[in-house]
Amino acid sequence: MTVDPDSRLQLLLSERENALGAWLEANVQLSSALDHLRQLHATKAEALKARWISPHQLAQFRRWEKEMVKPTDYRTIASYTQHRHIIASIDRRWDGAITAAQVEVDRATNELAVATADLLSTMPVALASELTDLSVRLLSTIVRAVANTHSAPATRMVQRH
């Protein structure tokens, strides 16, 4: 039994087109998930800003919480207690949504990796090699960008699961 070369070529082109479509869709999904995550972080930052918590105060508070070292002078203790109440309230409100958005980014990143592998499997070896290098650089850039958007409590929450 012989295979018609034209039908084999059509099949390969169709597979490549389908893989490219899936890859493009995975890119759109990841971009959307990252935008949503950034938006949640920005909204949380705005909520803190609206309650007069500066980035410096938040960083100091996170250090105190992480190191389990509390301030010692009365004025700082009062400030810490007040900020702890405000920050904890905002954390409770936003960290669940941020964690869910991070899970969605992780899922979309995995789907992009699978779609990339599927697309590469439809290409000649030399082109696939070049695209693999590009995809690895792109995915590592995405991973670094996502890691930089994590807030301390959201990161701790994700690590517990």
Residue ranges and their predicted role:
Residues 1-31, 35, 80-84, 88:
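Short, charge-rich amphipathic alpha-helices with coiled-coil/heptad character
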Residues 30-80:
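Extended alpha-helical coiled-coil "stalk/arm" regions
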Residues 106-122:
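Short, amphipathic alpha-helical "recognition" segments used to contact nucleic acids or chromatin
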Residues 126:
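Residues within the helices of the helix-turn-helix
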Residues 129:
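The alpha-helix within a helix-turn-helix
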Residues 132-142:
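Short, basic interhelical loop/turn and adjoining N-cap
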Residues 144-147:
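Residue-level detection of the helix-turn-helix DNA-binding "recognition helix"
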Residues 150-161:
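Short Lys/Arg-enriched helix C-cap and helix-to-coil transition segments
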